[in-house]
Amino acid sequence: TEEGEFLHEGGGVR
């Protein structure tokens, strides 16, 4: 999801 991608980016996953 878009929110999931945001969380991933914020968490440094990407």
From Swiss-Prot:
Q: What does this protein do?
A: Cleaved by the protease thrombin to yield monomers which, together with fibrinogen beta (FGB) and fibrinogen gamma (FGG), polymerize to form an insoluble fibrin matrix. Fibrin has a major function in hemostasis as one of the primary components of blood clots. In addition, functions during the early stages of wound repair to stabilize the lesion and guide cell migration during re-epithelialization. Was originally thought to be essential for platelet aggregation, based on in vitro studies using anticoagulated blood.
Q: Write down the superkingdom of origin.
A: Eukaryota
Name the record gives this protein = Fibrinogen alpha chain
- What GO CC annotations are associated with the protein? extracellular region
Which of UniProt's keywords are assigned here?
Answer: Adaptive immunity, Blood coagulation, Coiled coil, Disulfide bond, Hemostasis, Immunity, Innate immunity, Secreted
Q: Name one GO biological process term.
A: adaptive immune response
* Keyword Cell inner membrane part of the UniProt annotation: no
Question: Modified after translation how?
Answer: Conversion of fibrinogen to fibrin is triggered by thrombin, which cleaves fibrinopeptides A and B from alpha and beta chains, and thus exposes the N-terminal polymerization sites responsible for the formation of the soft clot. The soft clot is converted into the hard clot by factor XIIIA which catalyzes the epsilon-(gamma-glutamyl)lysine cross-linking between gamma chains (stronger) and between alpha chains (weaker) of different monomers. Forms F13A-mediated cross-links between a glutamine and the epsilon-amino group of a lysine residue, forming fibronectin-fibrinogen heteropolymers.
Cellular compartment(s) = Secreted
Q: Assembly and interactions?
A: Heterohexamer; disulfide linked. Contains 2 sets of 3 non-identical chains (alpha, beta and gamma). The 2 heterotrimers are in head to head conformation with the N-termini in a small central domain.
Q: According to its record, what is known about the domains?
A: A long coiled coil structure formed by 3 polypeptide chains connects the central nodule to the C-terminal domains (distal nodules). The long C-terminal ends of the alpha chains fold back, contributing a fourth strand to the coiled coil structure.
